[in-house]
Amino acid sequence: MVGLTPQHYGNAIALMTYLASTALADNKFPDCTSGPLSKLAVCDTSRDVTTRAQSLVDAMSFAEKVNNTQYEAPGVPRLGLPAYNWWSEALHGVAGAPGVHFADSGPFSYATSFAQPILLGASFDDELVKQVATVVGTEGRAFGNAGRAGLDYWTPNINPFRDPRWGRGQETPGEDPLHVSRYVYHLVDGLQGGIGPARPQIAATCKHFAAYDMEDWNGVSRHEFDARVSTQDLAEFYLPSFKSCVRDAQVDAVMCSYNALNGVPTCADPYLLQTLLREHWDWDQPGHWVVSDCGAIDDIYIGHNYTKTGAEAAAVALNAGTDLDCGTVFPKHLGEAAEQGLYTNQTLDRALVRLYSSLVKLGYFDPAEKQPYGSIGWKDVDTPAAEQLAHKAAVEGIVLLKNDQTLPLKAKGTLALIGPYANATKQMQGNYQGPPKYIRTLEWAATQHGYQVQYSPGTAINNSSTAGFAAALAAAKDADVVLYAGGIDNTIESETLDRTTITWPGNQLSLISELSNLHKPLIVIQFGGGQVDDTPLLTNPHVNALLWAGYPSQEGGAAIFDILTGKAAPAGRLPITQYPAAYTAQVPMTEMGLRAGGDNPGRTYRWYDKAVVPFGFGLHYTSFEVSWDRGRLGPYNTAALVNRAPGGSHVDRALFDTFRVQVQNTGTVTSDYVALLFVKTEDAGPEPYPLKTLVGYTRVQQVKPGERRSVEIEVTLGAMARTAANGDLVLYPGKYTLQVDVGERGYPTARVSVHGKEVVLDHFPQPPEGR
């Protein structure tokens, strides 16, 4: 999402900073008791949402309407409508943004900072996602109630992680459409306080709609990039998470993206914003609105050259269904566009009614006693329960990639703590962060666990200096155990910054190699959102253990040491594919196709089979055996499956079956187990067939040694279906193989047969001619 503003445009949009202004926020609640607004229906809580919002819009002059189509809305002083800043952020906790104002100290000077979405996604724990989101939503509401933020937040980022070089992959839960879809459903449920609630806790915003996953690659910028995507890939990969967010979770807001899609900038695309979003996904209820990414409406005429003037850009965006400009094109040019007859007053009113309907639902115009979330305040921010949840979220996501029985550590002693993350603080938060009350460093955690720590960073994230190597090696020689903490950070991957390589920085690899030559127990902690090719570490016999920790945030050091010492057992799974370093030379970032063919080696685990570490991989401190609970599965009939779907619901969400497997802990350590269920076929529907597809998962908590659990994995019709070339979601007859886990473990498979005729579960709206 939201953008660092395109600097070459010269727009007067504030850049986001980590430390927000200490001044009080612009957002103050209006006076609906005695002020001018009290005479309007917007303050009458007995009226319906649309009537209330319409009364406010009707009272505005044309100039006042135009002025309030920007994120930094000035309000209408003569009506008693205060200014309102729509731009608040809360990707993994309330974060710095133009609309969020942290105090210097005391109340509202911090908020709980949870693990970045890429690490939370690695937990494959839907209930945990909802719990985290509930806390983030509660704390967001507390800031909003205090006038230190808005009541809407521009989160989550749900673009699937297509290319390993993408700088913002850390903001997403992973690469698989089903996984991202389930993640966002539970996240929005927690943020907003339910599925489509009449009175949401906050308004969430799903972004970036659509096919946005590139910042700046080889001189191609997101501000002018035209993503060429087939209808099949669009429906199968790029849109399912948005369908889940919009149609199923009923989010209140959506953000259109910087890029164009098949020739049309997304914020100017009625096919995306009207045909798909509002009509096909039935998302035109009161209080649902679309905001542009910041500067994206500028891009319509400056980056994409889709229109010649700012007035034309403003009009095409408004007509397409963009309601709010995170920028200044609307307030600067809608007046001129109106004079040219490029849009109607009704279209302008429609946008404003959508926006103010959202604020009506949020209780912005209600007296305190009628606001269901009005009592939320500072007492509800960073509570002990929230801190415990932040710890749990970090622990559950950590993935063990290699272990030769060195872990868990069995004795206290001297520990050499080396690497650019060895004493990291903010670095462990990733991007879109806010100030937390504390950040548990690795050094702090090691001391808490009784280790004598010898700290020596040795090297930076990415440079050519070896000046610190000698001190690091000296510290390692005197230690019982060596812990190297490194990887990548926001100087290598971030918004506006894609990677050009997916290797470990050379200086870090050199230091790790020299440390391994000491033949001391060597554990490497890999930080960062995107993966790096771990081949040099996986093949080095003197690198004894390797963990991926993503961006674990405020509880990072404590969570990692709980794993290292065995206080907690690792059970996270990689939510993305770890590609070999050579992959970046095989396919350009601008190639949006998923399927292998021609010069495209394929993307994601569904179409690429040469991974260094596959999607879904994760080791444990114990061992598990998995077996099928039923000897015979099915047979199934397409017509019968569809006919038994509940009336009034979307048939793709109906149950195909609930599969049961037996999971037994055959080792000696109590551990969670993530049961991933994949399906593959070689005759159901047309070729080419994906290598396999995730159709369901569940996280089994705390399985004790020797314990056997019966685990249920629900699979929907939509998960078993495939996407046709025209985008239709089709359930095909044929033979399917079910596989638990990532395949390397040799767990048994099961075969099922689906009979009958192919059935279309969802007819995908066809794009306009020529697209």
Curated annotation (Swiss-Prot):
Location of the protein in the cell = Secreted
A Gene Ontology cellular component where this protein is annotated is:
extracellular region
Question: Glycosylated at which positions?
Answer: 67, 305, 345, 423, 462-463
So, what pathway does this thing act in? Glycan degradation; xylan degradation
Q: What is its EC number?
A: 3.2.1.37
Q: Which domain of life is it from?
A: Eukaryota
Q: What InterPro entries does UniProt report for this protein, alphabetically?
A: BXL (IPR044993), Fn3-like (IPR026891), Glyco_hydro_3_C (IPR002772), Glyco_hydro_3_C_sf (IPR036881), Glyco_hydro_3_N (IPR001764), Glyco_hydro_3_N_sf (IPR036962), Glycoside_hydrolase_SF (IPR017853), Ig-like_fold (IPR013783)
| Protein's name according to its UniProt entry | Probable exo-1,4-beta-xylosidase bxlB
This chain's source organism reads: Aspergillus clavatus (strain ATCC 1007 / CBS 513.65 / DSM 816 / NCTC 3887 / NRRL 1 / QM 1276 / 107)
The gene for this chain is bxlB
